[in-house]
């Protein structure tokens, strides 16, 4: 019996453990942190051996194959030992892909992943297809393959997940864009991060499709290096030669594999960045074969994604918008670009090698104030203090929202769009967004 060790017992690790057990492997799960009770119960229910708070090196190094949580960097000591030994290390997605013939619609990119993924799932589900949502959002792909298999999966993939995928094949691959992000995990080398994102195209055949933003200079440059066999499906904001998705004369248009159009005004998502998300999603659904009536309806009634330009409400005359998912500078740029009122920008957190020059002009144009929110705000002071905009320095969400109240005038918008990861002060991005929403709503009580 082959031995599989799973490092990390979160959503992906626990799910992979269940599938490995079902497929007859000897399974051992190890997590350096404390494992959540629901994942302990899931593993106990399937008689899976696990440990928390430490790694039993002897057991781990005895594995025939290791499934690694995407949150564990390759520099981790245990990963280094496994690599030195030559033990294969894969991702949960790679493992799950071995045990299903379902059609895989996979989405990656520095920005827009979650919105595009959620929109595709919304449309395909509305069409009555047997579809699962997996990857960065939804349930573990491996757990679904083991217990509730579907004919289609819509999967949001981070660069960390793609790093350990080798034979997995995306039937429809979407690359929304590539901008600097997570460079701390890629030796601060942009090419390393780019190579990870481009892995979404690996193993594609003539039967598959690759959807990408035609105006992304990095993607178009990279494409010249790859001899892709899949159908190339570029999209752009306006009609360009070769593009099969675009906006023209106030209409949203798709030209592959069938012609589709609808009034742009009918689209539920607003803002330039959401034009790109909607074009990518529409092309994927058109390729899958969704009927045009359902496609039109899905693009029209999609409710949006929590923590992504989420309107919290208007309190004491000030609008509050939660964009906690904006964990890089590019995402913040799109958020600021969509603002139509004077904006108090909340920015800060765990910096991932950010270059803030990209947003300085927009900050000067749109912002009436900036509130820094992080354990260490020095880099923000160095970048923004000289712009001549009022700034405040805070280290908790409570103090941050209080500072926003002080700076904002009726009619202004307070925008949480941090450019950074959340782990310095919060459990995760969702915790940051929930705290912001709760404190904003308390203003109106």
What is each stretch, according to the model?
Residues 1-91, 95, 270, 382, ...:
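N-terminal leader/targeting and accessory segments in enzymes
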Residues 51-54, 90-94, 227-247, 296-300, ...:
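Beta-strand->loop->alpha-helix junctions that form or flank phosphate-binding loops
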Residues 11, 73, 111-115, 275, ...:
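Residue-level detector of alpha-helix initiation sites
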Residues 26-32, 210-214, 346-347, 366-375:
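Short internal beta-strands
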Residues 3, 15-23, 130, 262-368:
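Nucleotide phosphate-binding/pyrophosphate-handling subdomain across enzymes
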Residues 39-41, 357-412:
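C-terminal helical cap/extension that packs against the catalytic core
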Residues 20, 66, 107, 136, ...:
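Residue-level signal for inorganic ion chemistry
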Residues 2, 21-22, 58-61, 70-214, ...:
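Phosphate-binding loop of NTP-binding sites
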